[in-house]
Amino acid sequence: GVGREDGKEKGEYSALWYKKDRFNVLDSGYFWLSETPEVAGSKGWDGACERIASWVKLQDKVSDKEYFALNTHLDHVGGMARREGISLMLDRVNELSDGLPVIVTGDFNSEPESDVIKHVTDSANPEHLTDARQASSIVYGPSWSFHDFGKIPYNKRPLIDYVFVRNGLKVLRYGILAETENNGFLSDHTPVLVTVE
């Protein structure tokens, strides 16, 4: 990934991590969630911040299977930026994935019942994705992913971080890892861990 503010190192990254000993990179890139997605640092619609999506095509060195993965972080303020950003992202996933199995991850700053997430998962939309939580037969952990370093009461914590899949990926396990050591937090979000095949 690259920094969202300048396309180099400045600002937040929406990086993708992979095991180099397991996968070869076939192609990769990034685009901004804006009206000008190829312009580095462009801010979209009513967004408060620049937002970026990073993607990669990987080949498994063991099975030779290929996969497409994308990671993003939708705007926390602009509703239009989230809606338009997700439409752009779905178009790009469709265009770039070449029919490969797809994994999309990120902080969508949207709860499951929001119009943004409904658009992503709407089966009437040919570009739709499947929520890994809904697809998994094994689900563990809480139903929330954002806690603001423990400041939000348990019953008010929202689920805003997602893993979506498409094109034949089977979700074996889905979990939100909410355990902390000595009440310490590494982030204001909890990790979402998904096992697919």
Model-identified regions with their sequence ranges:
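Active-site metal-binding loops of divalent metal-dependent hydrolases
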Residues: 72-74, 106-108, 190
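Hydrophobic pocket-lining residues within nucleotide cofactor-binding pockets
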Residues: 33, 72-74, 169
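Short histidine/acidic/glycine/proline-rich micro-motifs that form metal-
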Residues: 5-8, 75-77, 109-111
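Conserved hydrophobic/aromatic beta-strand scaffold that supports enzyme active sites
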Residues: 14-16, 53-57, 71, 162-163, ...
